């Protein structure tokens, strides 16, 4: 019989975060706290912040992957807002999701209307407008 107070014979196990249990990088605890503080509902279930965190992490990973590809296409090693804009606007589903979102310093997609492009001329034919 051991003397003193406390738990005898048990070793303390390090606590595992809910993010680690779910295999996520984003913080489940912080999302849960923000859901509670935001007055979205009177009560928040234990699975809701895990699900929401996983959705947020997936969306962030998807956007960052496409933005990284856009940066690599432009021979840059750092993602800037322009790359985020190009990634989102060139992806049909992300463009639909973030259609009303304005990205600061994002610029616009390069687009020239078909009517403004020069006309394709036939072989050897001289245009009437160039004859004098």
Swiss-Prot record:
Post-translational modification: Phosphorylated to form H2AS128ph (gamma-H2A) in response to DNA double-strand breaks (DSBs) generated by exogenous genotoxic agents and by stalled replication forks. Phosphorylation is dependent on the DNA damage checkpoint kinases MEC1/ATR and TEL1/ATM, spreads on either side of a detected DSB site and may mark the surrounding chromatin for recruitment of proteins required for DNA damage signaling and repair. Gamma-H2A is removed from the DNA prior to the strand invasion-primer extension step of the repair process and subsequently dephosphorylated. Acetylated by ESA1 to form H2AK4ac and H2AK7ac.
Chain span(s) of sequence motif [ST]-Q motif: 129-130
Keywords: Acetylation, Chromosome, DNA damage, DNA repair, DNA-binding, Methylation, Nucleosome core, Nucleus, Phosphoprotein
Chain segments carrying region Disordered: 1-21
Gene Ontology biological process terms in this record: DNA repair; heterochromatin formation
Superkingdom classification of source: Eukaryota
GO molecular-function terms, A-Z: DNA binding; protein heterodimerization activity; structural constituent of chromatin
Cellular component per GO, a single term: nucleus
Residue numbers bearing the Phosphoserine modification: 129
N5-methylglutamine sites (modified residues): 105
N-acetylserine PTM sites in chain numbering: 2
Main location: nucleus
Subcellular location: Nucleus; Chromosome
List of residues that carry N6-acetyllysine: 5, 7
Cystines in this chain: none
InterPro entries documented for this protein: Histone-fold, Histone_H2A, Histone_H2A/H2B/H3, Histone_H2A_C, Histone_H2A_CS
Annotated site residue numbers, Not ubiquitinated: 119
Note: In contrast to vertebrates and insects, its C-terminus is not monoubiquitinated.
Subunit text: The nucleosome is a histone octamer containing two molecules each of H2A, H2B, H3 and H4 assembled in one H3-H4 heterotetramer and two H2A-H2B heterodimers. The octamer wraps approximately 147 bp of DNA.
UniProt domain comment: The [ST]-Q motif constitutes a recognition sequence for kinases from the PI3/PI4-kinase family.
Physiological role: Core component of nucleosome which plays a central role in DNA double strand break (DSB) repair. Nucleosomes wrap and compact DNA into chromatin, limiting DNA accessibility to the cellular machineries which require DNA as a template. Histones thereby play a central role in transcription regulation, DNA repair, DNA replication and chromosomal stability. DNA accessibility is regulated via a complex set of post-translational modifications of histones, also called histone code, and nucleosome remodeling.
Family to which this protein belongs: Belongs to the histone H2A family.
Protein name as catalogued: Histone H2A.1
């Amino acid at each position: 019989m051991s003397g003193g107070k406390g738990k005898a014979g048990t070793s303390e196990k390090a606590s595992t975060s809910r993010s680690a249990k779910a295999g996520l990088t984003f913080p489940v605890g912080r999302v849960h706290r923000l859901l509670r503080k935001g007055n979205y509902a009177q009560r928040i279930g234990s699975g809701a912040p895990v699900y929401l965190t996983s959705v947020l992490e997936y969306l962030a990973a998807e956007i960052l992957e496409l933005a990284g590809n856009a940066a690599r296409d432009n021979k840059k090693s750092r993602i800037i807002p322009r790359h985020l804009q190009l990634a989102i606007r060139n992806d049909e589903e992300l463009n639909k999701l973030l259609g009303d979102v304005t990205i600061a310093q994002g610029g616009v997609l390069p687009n020239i209307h078909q009517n403004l492009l020069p006309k394709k001329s036939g072989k050897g034919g001289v245009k009437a407008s160039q004859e004098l």
